[in-house]
Amino acid sequence: MPAIDLSTIDLRAIKPSDLDWRKFTLDTGHPMRRIFIWSVAVNMGIGQSGERLEKAAKVMSELTGRTPSYRLAHKSIKDFGIRRGEPIGLLVTLRRNEAVWFLLRALAAVDFTLREESFNAGNVSFGIREHILVPGSRYDPALGIFGFDVAVTLARPGFRVQYRRRARADVGKDHRVSREETIRFFQDVLGVRILKR
């Protein structure tokens, strides 16, 4: 049973404050074993700086409600006209209510259908070809159409130990989220259909 009945809500009008990210968890019987959405990263690779990148930044901030950070080129590629250190992409990381809010809208853009190959241990990635497919977004001829990638990371309570500054430690193998659990989370909690290979 999905955590939210999508037939009763309008994804074009929903706001992050209307959602509670704690409801979007997969209960596995023990409070420390429950699985939840850790983060949703939205990435746009533009491949060039300048006006097109600024337009993409405007589109991304409208989509996510956050100011994107600029991603820089790691090396110079003369054929593409890219210099090292030049901004060529955008990234926004969303957490908690904003993450669930954006993920529901992004999944609606792909009809709540994902390929089995998109899943690995605790992570899911998928792309959207045109940002206007996302409910609530609008087409602006002055900006154009951009595609983007969505990367979702799932976690369990206690995962913070691998990111904290003091007394950092690895998460045990048995406590990590497996690929099967990731697929089950998306099917049971978000109501996603999985396309087999």
Swiss-Prot record:
The free-text function statement in the UniProt record for this protein reads: This is one of the proteins that bind and probably mediate the attachment of the 5S RNA into the large ribosomal subunit, where it forms part of the central protuberance. In the 70S ribosome it contacts protein S13 of the 30S subunit (bridge B1b), connecting the 2 subunits; this bridge is implicated in subunit movement. May contact the P site tRNA; the 5S rRNA and some of its associated proteins might help stabilize positioning of ribosome-bound tRNAs.
Quaternary structure and interacting proteins, as annotated:
Part of the 50S ribosomal subunit; contacts the 5S rRNA and probably tRNA. Forms a bridge to the 30S subunit in the 70S ribosome.
What keywords sit in the KW lines?
Ribonucleoprotein, Ribosomal protein, RNA-binding, rRNA-binding, tRNA-binding
Any idea what this protein is called? Answer: Large ribosomal subunit protein uL5
The cross-references to InterPro entries, in alphabetical order and at most eight, read:
Ribosomal_uL5, Ribosomal_uL5_arc, Ribosomal_uL5_C, Ribosomal_uL5_dom_sf, Ribosomal_uL5_N
Task: Kindly list the GO molecular function terms attached to this UniProt entry.
Answer: rRNA binding; structural constituent of ribosome; tRNA binding
> Domain of life of the organism in this record?
Archaea
Q: Tell me, what is an example of a GO biological process annotation in this record?
A: translation
Query: Per its UniProt record, what Pfam families does this chain match?
Result: Ribosomal_L5 (PF00281), Ribosomal_L5_C (PF00673)
Q: Which PANTHER family match?
A: 60S RIBOSOMAL PROTEIN L11-RELATED
CC annotations in GO? ribonucleoprotein complex; ribosome
Family per record? Belongs to the universal ribosomal protein uL5 family.
